[in-house]
Amino acid sequence: MDYHQRHVIVTGGAGALGTAVVGALLGVGAICHVPCHTQAEAQGFIHRDNPAVKLSVSGDLSDQAAVERLFAGVPELWASVHLAGGFAAAPIGATDKALLMQQLNVNFVSTFLCCRAAVGAMAGRGGRIVNVAARAALEWRSGAGMTAYAASKAALAALTVALAEEVAREEILVNAVAPSIIDTPANRRAMPNADFDAWPKVDEVAATIVFLASPDHQVTRGAVVPVYGRA
């Protein structure tokens, strides 16, 4: 697999999964554009000194103008990988409109706007878009106790499938991965008694994403790929 200096945007690239995705992309020759929330996040990014990493401070990706500025600064975009998001769990009685809108904004609206900008940037050349859904987007009953999160990720999955059909003739392949619980330090702290060995590792999920975004991947569109490990 060779990206050969192809430009790739990775939102959420400074997170645990994002760091693994960026590292894997760098290993196959990509130039990675990583928007960070703050200057401090950019300064702390482990790959910041790699010349093939282009960091920026984008602010809120649910803001259309901010997203358009981000994509306008990337030449000849090949792939856009949308990892930025957030998780909140609460019973519906404790889920007010503010929490619902927060989950929709960080998970669905930000991804929608990035997809929209990516399609515009790829016009006439084709490319790849990879989103991140969740197990709750595919197995609705698993979203009990986190209805706002589950709804936001289900909307993202529907977006992925619908957009894949819309842009297929433009040679833009749109897919998503749907993790269960990824093995990250934060998840281990949150669930100290869980079976960590059953969780998919960040490098394993990253490998799936990098393939879906690659020029070697030619045929799959509209897939929401379960990446559950044994969890």
Identify the function of each model-found stretch.
Residues 6, 76-77, 122-134, 169-172, ...:
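Active-site loop of short-chain dehydrogenase/reductase
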Residues 14-15:
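Conserved glycine-rich cofactor-binding loop
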Residues 83-89:
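Conserved NAD(P)H cofactor-binding loop of Rossmann-fold oxidoreductase domains
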Residues 91-92, 99-104:
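Substrate-binding pocket helix/loop in short-chain dehydrogenase/reductase
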Residues 115-116, 161:
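A short, exposed helix-loop element centered on a Lys and neighboring polar residues
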Residues 128-155, 160-169:
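Catalytic loop of short-chain dehydrogenase/reductase
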Residues 169, 176, 184, 194-231:
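C-terminal helical subdomain
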